[in-house]
Amino acid sequence: MRLGFIGTGKIASSVITGICNSKISFQKILISRRNKNIARNLEKKFKKVYIAKSNQEIVDKCNWIFLAVTPKIGKQILPKLKFSSNQKVISFIATINLAQLKKTLGKKVKIIRAIPLPPI
């Protein structure tokens, strides 16, 4: 299992740390360089975490993709990315609903919404 994180803020950092400290089996985690300091720290801290060159590289190389960006950034970057039907996408983006995600990512992509409270 290859995991990818688009966005490297508090939510992504917490989830990545939790996964790396758990017994979940995975090959590697690719992360975006959205927040360069957090990305570098995660890459140094965990041996299976790598910084991707682009968001599309994350989509191309991972079968589970976590969307951890603000709604504004999500609306800017998601339409440019090419997902495949065998991927699973977990969205932490509070104000982009399931119908909007399906329209943007493609109807065959499996999408799970996981909204943190309070939404940020």
Predicted ranges, named:
Residues 38, 46, 55-60, 64-120:
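Rossmann-like NAD(P)(H) cofactor-binding subdomain of soluble oxidoreductases
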Residues 1-53, 57:
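NAD(P)+-binding Rossmann beta1-loop-alpha1 motif at the extreme N-terminus of oxidoreductases
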